[in-house]
Design a protein with these regions (language model features):
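N-terminal membrane-anchoring/stem segments of glycan-assembly enzymes
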Residues: 3-292, 344, 554-558, 681-684, ...
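Cell-envelope/extracellular polymer assembly enzymes that use nucleotide-activated donors
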Residues: 295-297, 328, 480
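Long helical/loop segments within the catalytic core of UDP-sugar-dependent glycosyltransferases
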Residues: 274-278, 352-376, 387-475, 486-487, ...
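Short, acidic, metal-binding catalytic loop of nucleotide-sugar glycosyltransferases
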Residues: 315-326
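Structured alpha-helical
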Residues: 3-14, 650-657, 664-880
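The conserved acidic donor/metal-binding loop of glycosyltransferases
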Residues: 381-385
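A conserved acidic beta->alpha catalytic loop
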Residues: 333-340, 356-357
């Protein structure tokens, strides 16, 4: 009883002290919190924290008054009128995000601006040094003209073919390569102590910074050399000094990571070789006499696609600019559908079907070859729509050089792919396949190893007949066919001009299904017709084809990288047996140099950090098919990629996300264990923990972005809309109004700059649209739709017949230059910007995971977890 009395007296004294010391406004604040529903634990915790803050800071005075008034602006998660128990943690997370992540900032940060100005000045000095060094290097080798910046392929706009060197230039290049390899071997194997390694890498780092600012072949090739040397030293160190063999388990994990790193190094070096001298080939002009132009057969294979999907392609093929007596369009229907035959007959296309449906698409094309006789064959997937200048852009090289068997053009898509759509990427950013179709193929062309991609290509019939038609031994018949053609001595070419565009896969699951087939097929080729062996190929051709196949074995290495830090967290296994200082001295430079060099190489074709997301999404799903193909290459069948669909509501594809969820759970557990070791271990290894925790955080960012891609966005339009800016005349009630067409699909157009008379049109009211394809003027009937806002209105097309529909296709889909695009130079593709973008995508992915958690009992859990995630303050929004 006396103990209870003493406690009551102590409580009374403390209460009296607080009432005497603390201002009346604080007591009123406590009372306000209580009336607004704050819980007792929240009152105790937040009251104690507020009391401590008042003791340290005079919060009731200026300038803290301004901070108090804007608390909700910068911390949207916090309600000052009704605090929650863990608001302090929310403030810490949001503060960290505002200080170190959020790129924007309120005005008035003069000190920060001064620091940034100093950094920019230092950067300009480094850039100037780099320019002087680069000019000095260029002057040394100025006699080898193709190495200079001015001779970079395609800069002059002239027609380009593979570079031809004189004997002296070849000799100089061979000597330089041999000396370079010897020097690289010495640099890679030369033993340094830790201080020597730091000095060497410092020199390499500043060399990289200087060279990265010079746009010339020589600077890029020197960056390749520096990257290979730095990464080579890292791997030499890994192989000779860091393999942990204390126990069998240690050896297993250590060797697993080392093998994954060796794979990544091999892909990196082969990639550098593949694109070290890209050829920007332009179309070659055709003979002026159109009578000598060759005959061309257009093949459009189809199996189970809808008629609406193939219509634009057939119309565009019929609209190709080519002599009518030398052009024949064929619809190859492996589905044997009467509606398709009737459509082909009505529009004037040929219709071919076969009794036996062997070997899928390859068999379909090979059968069509037996009943046609054109000198050249053009193959379009049924959703790939060519512009009318497709043949004018591609046939010139085939007519000029009788040894060219294949001319391939890049694959572009007019509907957003799952990455672009689900990650809400800017449409100006390069899409997932841009790196290969817009850049690597130009490198392949340099080495006469252009790969047939199954569509948007022209092939010489004589060459196809020589190799037995389209290859049927694997499920990637296109790449295998180009390999066979090169083995027989035929050449290939890649035209760097988008003259066709197709439909992307609508969902992530469809995309993964397509890539599984590609991965299986490429490994089948590796096993059945390995490019490293056999006759007919040059060494560069072998390396280019081998690298294409090696790429699809990234499944296991990528998974290893995603779990590599966990053995240390779970069982104190050192997968890199070295001190933390040595790891910093070797690992970080290896990562920085390879990342910067690849970014310099891929600028305009791949956004920073997204390669890891692309590979992570596919890694689990291609692992088993590629492994099976290595063991049993004849197993597997051709699957048709579904195209042309809608998505009624937004959802998270939990089934496709299961591998990512497992990896997220493992990394989160590892993260928790790591923090536990840091705070509660008697002798924590802080540097080692920092390295592994940083690795885990990066893995979680990649996995969070992967989850974002699995969130399927609504797609209400059955016919994708395509942007196009051309003038249009709208005739209503006998009056012609000038306007601008800004978007179209197969059945609709969107028109802006409408005057008041057109905005008042009733729904369904008929108008006449006058459009030009650049040469001819066409008139179409359309009906006003319900959508109208700010001088913009949709109109539904009402085609009188197939001829009118074909003419509309010529004015839109098949319009000359319709698909031609160039990388946007205004895109900010710096590493910091890319990292922030990756962070934002990952946050969106984790938010979506919580949002789409199944069940009705979890809303509170979702809201609670979401409240801890950082948010953009309203202060930033209003100032923007």
């Amino acid at each position: 009883r006396s103990s209870l009395l003493r406690r009551f007296q102590l409580f009374f004294v403390m209460t009296s002290f607080l009432r005497a010391v603390l201002p009346q406004t604080l007591c009123a604040r406590f009372e306000s919190w209580r009336k607004n529903g704050a819980s007792t634990p929240s009152l105790l915790v937040n009251g104690l924290l507020l009391t401590l803050l008042l003791v340290i800071f005079p919060l009731e005075r200026e300038p803290f008054g301004t901070l108090r008034s804007r608390l909700r602006d910068y911390y949207p998660q916090i309600n000052p009128e009704c605090p929650r128990l863990l608001d302090s943690l929310r403030i810490i997370i949001q503060s960290f995000w505002l200080l170190f992540v959020k790129p924007g900032r309120p005005s008035g940060a003069e000190a920060v601006e001064k620091v940034l100005a100093g950094l920019r000045a230092a950067g300009r000095i480094i850039n100037r040094v780099g320019e002087l060094w680069g000019n000095f290097c260029l002057s040394i080798i100025r006699r080898v003209k193709p190495l200079s910046e001015a001779s970079n392929a395609g800069d002059s706009g002239e027609v380009n073919d593979r570079t031809q060197f004189s004997f002296g230039e070849k000799t100089l290049i061979v000597i330089a390569v041999i000396l370079g390899l010897i020097l690289a071997a010495i640099c890679i194997t030369q033993p340094f102590n830790l201080q020597g390694q730091v000095v060497f890498l410092t020199f390499m780092f500043f060399s990289m910074i200087a060279l990265a600012r010079i746009r010339a072949r020589i600077s890029l090739m020197l960056l390749f050399v520096i990257s290979i040397v730095v990464s080579g030293r890292y791997l030499w160190w890994r192989c000779t000094s860091t393999v942990n063999s204390d126990t069998a388990l240690d050896l297993f994990f250590s060797c697993a990571l080392l093998l994954a790193e060796l794979y990544a190094f091999a892909v990196m070096v082969l990639g550098y070789f593949q694109v070290c001298w890209v050829l920007d080939r332009k179309p070659y002009p055709l003979p002026a006499n159109r009578k000598v132009w060759p005959t061309v057969d257009i093949f459009i294979p189809t199996y189970n696609e809808s008629l609406d999907v193939i219509k634009p392609t057939v119309y565009a093929a019929l609209n190709l600019d080519w002599p009518a007596d030398k052009l024949r369009v064929y619809l190859l229907d492996d589905g044997s559908r009467d509606a398709f035959k009737a459509f082909a007959d009505e529009v004037g296309a040929g219709y071919i079907k076969r009794e036996e449906h062997n070997h899928a698409k390859a068999g379909n094309i090979n059968h069509a070859m037996t009943v046609t006789d054109g000198e050249f064959i053009v193959i379009f997937d049924c959703d790939h729509v060519p512009s009318c200048d497709f043949l004018l852009s591609t046939m010139g090289w085939l007519v000029k050089d009788p040894k060219i068997a294949l001319v391939q053009t890049p694959h572009h898509f007019y509907s957003p792919d799952p990455f672009e759509k689900n990650m809400h990427l800017d449409r100006r950013l390069p899409i997932e396949n841009s790196l290969f179709h817009d850049f690597i193929q130009k490198g392949n062309d340099t080495w006469n190893a252009t790969m047939f991609c199954g569509s948007s290509a022209v092939m010489r019939r004589a060459a196809l007949n020589e190799v037995g038609g389209i290859a049927v031994e694997t499920v990637t018949e296109d790449a295998h066919t180009s390999l066979k053609l090169n083995r027989r001595g035929w050449s290939s070419a890649f035209i760097d001009r988008a003259v066709a565009s197709g439909l992307s896969t609508e969902t992530l699951s469809a995309h993964i299904g397509q890539r599984i087939r590609w991965a299986r097929g490429m490994i089948q080729i590796f096993r059945l017709d390995n490019p490293l062996f056999g006759r007919g190929l040059t060494l560069p051709q072998r390396l280019c084809f081998f690298n294409a196949m090696l790429h699809f074995l990234h499944g296991l290495p990528r998974l290893i990288f995603l779990v590599a830090p966990l053995p240390y967290m779970f069982a104190d296994i050192y997968i890199i047996y070295a001190t933390a200082a040595s790891i910093f001295a070797y690992v970080i430079p290896h990562m920085v140099h390879s990342a910067v060099t690849n970014q310099m190489l891929q600028r305009g074709y791949r956004y920073p950090f997204l390669s890891g997301v692309y590979e992570t999404i596919l890694s689990w799903y291609i692992l088993i098919p590629t492994t099976v193909a290595l063991i049993a290459p004849h197993v597997g069948k051709f699957n048709v990629t579904a195209k042309g669909g809608t998505i009624d509501k937004k959802y998270l594809d939990w089934d496709i996300s299961k591998p990512y969820l497992v990896l997220i759970a493992l990394n989160l557990i590892g993260l928790a264990i790591g923090f536990g070791k840091a705070f509660f271990s008697p002798n924590p290894e802080f540097l080692t923990l920092i390295i592994n925790l940083g690795w885990i955080v990066y893995n979680l960012m990649i996995l969070g972005a992967s989850m974002a891609v699995a969130v399927e966005e609504v797609q209400t339009h059955a016919f994708p809309r395509v942007p196009l800016s051309v003038p249009v005349e709208v005739e209503a009630d006998g009056v012609i109004h000038q306007a601008e067409l800004v978007e179209y699909s197969q059945v609709e157009v969107r028109i802006k700059n409408l005057d008041e008379a057109l905005t008042r049109l009733s729904e369904g009211q008929a108008v006449r649209l006058h459009l030009s394809d650049g040469e001819h003027r066409f008139t179409f009937t359309a009906a006003a739709s319900v959508f109208e806002t700010k001088g913009i209105r949709d109109f539904t097309m009402r085609f009188a017949d197939k001829t009118e529909e074909r003419n509309f296709n010529r004015c839109t889909f098949a319009r000359r230059g319709m698909w031609a695009t160039t990388p946007d130079p205004t895109i900010d593709d710096r590493f910091l910007t890319g990292f922030v973008q990756l962070w934002n995508i990952a946050v969106y992915g984790y938010r979506s995971m919580i949002e789409f958690l199944p069940g009705k009992t979890l809303p509170a859990l979702r809201d609670g977890i979401i409240s801890f995630l950082p948010k953009t303050p309203s202060a930033y929004k209003t100032e923007a």
